[in-house]
Amino acid sequence: MERSPAVCCQDPRAELVERVAAISVAHLEEAEEGPEPASNGVDPPPRARAASVIPGSASRPTPVRPSLSARKFSLQERPAGSCLEAQVGPYSTGPASHMSPRAWRRPTIESHHVAISDTEDCVQLNQYKLQSEIGKGAYGVVRLAYNEREDRHYAMKVLSKKKLLKQYGFPRRPPPRGSQAPQGGPAKQLLPLERVYQEIAILKKLDHVNVVKLIEVLDDPAEDNLYLVFDLLRKGPVMEVPCDKPFPEEQARLYLRDIILGLEYLHCQKIVHRDIKPSNLLLGDDGHVKIADFGVSNQFEGNDAQLSSTAGTPAFMAPEAISDTGQSFSGKALDVWATGVTLYCFVYGKCPFIDEYILALHRKIKNEAVVFPEEPEVSEELKDLILKMLDKNPETRIGVSDIKLHPWVTKHGEEPLPSEEEHCSVVEVTEEEVKNSVKLIPSWTTVILVKSMLRKRSFGNPFEPQARREERSMSAPGNLLLKEGCGEGGKSPELPGVQEDEAAS
């Protein structure tokens, strides 16, 4: 039998080294499938490969994790200093040209779009690395997100699509349960998720100094989560309620001017916010207030939104929103009421109507008059404005345009606010913009999230705080106004969920 020239010329010592290396590598990689390391014929001694593993293990211990679905995943998760970084050997990425094709392709398995970090509580979605939790609410949580491409931090709100579809803004609320849609209705009815995408496309195009900017939205089709990326405002909410040191009257006036301009801009875009309150008003670096958190907002058609559902925070709800009459009510007037409650909080550090029980709170909102404490003393003009904003009749309640002209707001005309035409321009979106309003995360991101849960030995939502159920309540503000700090920079979340109270679902 003839032997090939390559085999005849092979050094016996090299052949021995090859066999020893094959046995050693097989022992180290017995849990992985793949090509036999000895097939290359020039493997170095096993100590060369071991040296590339031990230093990495000393500086960054390899976490012990269960294998989930495929070998690709374990390769993607391989820590720094592993055999993928060896300069020689069957899995090296060095200049050797005699490696097996399968071994050569292994480094390309690692994705730069979706990956999971070895650090605790860190998941990466596309270019965003999710870090600590900075807020929470009834519809999801807010996490600090680091954009590696831009070297910049954002706030990523993780929302439940099921809850979003139930409460998110539609042109009209769906009919009551059990009723059927009328025959011969509108020519085109958008699917629920399409309606959400349409409104997201509008929110992405909103551009106003007093409205928080929505950067982009990521969607994982295989999961319930929807990820909204917002500008990060590190100064946080304008105030936490209750507050022992409320704002001076002049500071409250300046903040109200910002809120009214932002609210007028939203109404111009045919959006009602439905959850105006101090924790949803964030301070920018320039000291101006920005309206945030559109989790229960509504888009409307015509001159005003005609609403029939209850949403928002109980202590900030208008009487008509909690009425048992079943009649529809104005969305714009709803926002004015909530802004009036917010203004009251600014100067008194608490809500005008307080009770630990939801039914008692509703009764006070609908029936009791607004009471002004003796301290701190405020001007009669401010009291007049608050009473007009907290008019229990939405038909006679003051509107945004009249608030802008109120003597307390303008200092009797000395500081007029810009007209609607000067600071509002209607945003229109095309079908293409609606189509591209949400970026889809590759479906195998689900596997990454599952791996994160397995690593934490928890099968719950990795973004959901454990104490959420303990803090949820329908009463307000008593048990719901958890924090007592106030003032600028009380905390550093952008778009926190709900702190005065969680939005009612």
Swiss-Prot record:
Upper taxonomic lineage: Eukaryota, Metazoa, Chordata, Craniata, Vertebrata
List of residues that carry Asymmetric dimethylarginine: R78
Assembly and binders: Interacts with CAMK4 and calmodulin.
Gene for this chain: Camkk1
EC number: 2.7.11.17
Region (RP domain): 167-189
Activity modulation notes: Activated by Ca(2+)/calmodulin. Binding of calmodulin may relieve intrasteric autoinhibition. Partially inhibited upon phosphorylation by PRCAKA/PKA. May be regulated through phosphorylation by CAMK1 and CAMK4.
Name listed for the protein in its UniProt record: Calcium/calmodulin-dependent protein kinase kinase 1
InterPro entries reported for this sequence: Kinase-like_dom_sf, Prot_kinase_dom, Protein_kinase_ATP_BS, Ser/Thr_kinase_AS
Organism expressing this protein natively: Rattus norvegicus (Rat)
One GO term (biological process): intracellular signal transduction
Annotated stretches, region: Disordered: 27-66, 460-505
Compartmental location: Cytoplasm; Nucleus
Any one GO molecular function term: calmodulin binding
Ranges for region Autoinhibitory domain: 435-440
